[in-house]
Amino acid sequence: MNHSPIIIALDFPQKEPALTCAKQLSPQHCRLKIGSELFTREGAPLIAQLRELGFEIFLDLKFHDIPNTVAAAVRVAADLGVWMVNVHASGGLAMMQAAKEAATAAKQAPLLTAVTVLTSFDDAALGSVGVDDLMESQVQRLARLAFTAGLDGVVCSAAEVPVIKKSTAPQFLTVTPGIRPQQSAHDDQKRVFTPKEALAQGSDYLVIGRPITRAADPAQALNAIMATL
């Protein structure tokens, strides 16, 4: 069984480099995240190939639509055998409840998580889209909504994990992007933590991309990160 907290973001434009990277990694030491660009190009066959390699897959498509449409999308994701799938919490309570019902009804139910506020956002970015609350208040509101809807957890910055756990439940999962080893570039992330810092905050899963996938030796990079935990 895989007890690793690390989810590696396979942020590649096509399957060849994604599979090359995956084949250098062990499914005992990580899970893989497939995002919008790679899935849009390669679709379900890539999910099947990665699962054949033994990996559990987080399908990171952030569904956000009317409840029936999102429920249908979650059903299809479950049929692909993914380990986790997500929605945008800002889609509202009814949408998330419909998504949860669809996930629960699946033969192999995936974990269902909700994105609170993207880690590329800060208070100014929130204000620019009409959200007057500060980051922490908005994240708490959306996390509580996801918890009320019965979801398994949220995708959030490690900065918000303690308050989310306190306002929901200790077992409510927190999946945290914006994780960078010491000395790594922050790229397009505004709220960044090292893996050790994120776990100290209470994060359950750490999403790490470029520091591993762009390394000369991805397996060595992963092992180096695991050694710091």
Swiss-Prot record:
Its EC number is 4.1.1.23. It is an enzyme of class 4 (lyase). Substrate binds at residues 11, 33, 60-69, 119, 180, 189, 209-210. It comes from the Bacteria. Gene3D superfamilies: Aldolase class I (3.20.20.70). It holds the Pfam family OMPdecase. Keywords: Decarboxylase, Lyase, Pyrimidine biosynthesis. One of its GO terms (molecular function) is orotidine-5'-phosphate decarboxylase activity. GO terms for biological process: 'de novo' pyrimidine nucleobase biosynthetic process; 'de novo' UMP biosynthetic process. The active site is at K62 (proton donor). It catalyses: orotidine 5'-phosphate + H(+) = UMP + CO2. Pathway: Pyrimidine metabolism; UMP biosynthesis via de novo pathway; UMP from orotate: step 2/2. CDD domains: OMP_decarboxylase_like. Homodimer. This is Orotidine 5'-phosphate decarboxylase. It comes from Dichelobacter nodosus (strain VCS1703A).
